[in-house]
């Protein structure tokens, strides 16, 4: 299928939440009134200067924005091509980009009078950000997390509990992010009157993909300004990792209508694209999951396939619907990096720049290691460093110990 190239890549979604054939709102009847209320509340808040002003104040004084745009001099020298900059969203309060979105949604929940917040989480970063903002505003917080992720992301589980959240391990399915989202949706259907569902990525039923994108777009907006200050022009390329794709959409969206800017999204290729992986664009096809139509990993019978990634935050069998549309419109190039490539990038960045990245953005760095050497030295490449690696140190340490024993 070919997608017509629009006048603007930034005009979506339409009033029903569609990006071309993707998106929409496929939800239970009991949820539809809530979804429509949320859409109206968000439109009102977006048009309210007081809401925007309060959010900007918290961004500055609580989150710590703007995050720096950092020239990675040693990595640039090592790779011998493009000049590499990192957008350092791992320096935000809570350690990732997730707080950008959660701040906006929790402020919206308060505006709507909701006292109980639920969230799903994979790596735990969205859960930590949600627990943090709930603590700040005195709201009840319940976080659903796959039991496998609870085991591999223990530091974040402890952080959530210390912040006062109730963490519920999900034992169904593959016990990872998809299953956590299923349980959160079940909770929401049961508790519609007092509960706000804070979705962590650019997925779910409309208006969530649009809303999360808007809250995350501060990343790309700052990058435009900072790159003009640093280099006097726009970057030549952008690179970001993709699970659901909120950090990537936050960086990409403000640049979509700049044809001179190449854009690369990096999915998780896991053990390889012919084996277990989480690369929905590379290995999936359109279907419906969690309230929206998008590219999904499916078996021959159309059932959702199990995803795999070394990174809990990319371990999801789908991708945000706007990414699916940008893929078909050929505005963004979607690549993938394996577990081993991400691990090598994790170690390289730690040792060259003194920055321990999360395993999620390590996938983006892995592709930079392949892309940058083939670019001229005046090519400006911006990479979204969307999370810090504290949560992954125990897991990576265990992998390295096993490697050492085998060698």
UniProtKB/Swiss-Prot annotation:
This is Tryptophan synthase beta chain. One of its GO terms (cellular component) is cytoplasm. PROSITE patterns: TRP_SYNTHASE_BETA. Transmembrane segments: none annotated. It catalyses: (1S,2R)-1-C-(indol-3-yl)glycerol 3-phosphate + L-serine = D-glyceraldehyde 3-phosphate + L-tryptophan + H2O. PANTHER family: TRYPTOPHAN SYNTHASE, TRYPTOPHAN SYNTHASE-RELATED. Tetramer of two alpha and two beta chains. Its cofactor is pyridoxal 5'-phosphate. The keyword Secreted does not apply. GO terms for molecular function: tryptophan synthase activity. SUPFAM superfamilies: Tryptophan synthase beta subunit-like PLP-dependent enzymes (SSF53686). The gene is trpB. The modification N6-(pyridoxal phosphate)lysine is found at residue 98. Belongs to the TrpB family. It is an enzyme of class 4 (lyase). Keywords: Amino-acid biosynthesis, Aromatic amino acid biosynthesis, Lyase, Pyridoxal phosphate, Tryptophan biosynthesis. Coiled coil: none annotated. Pathway: Amino-acid biosynthesis; L-tryptophan biosynthesis; L-tryptophan from chorismate: step 5/5. The keyword Endoplasmic reticulum does not apply. Its EC number is 4.2.1.20. The beta subunit is responsible for the synthesis of L-tryptophan from indole and L-serine.
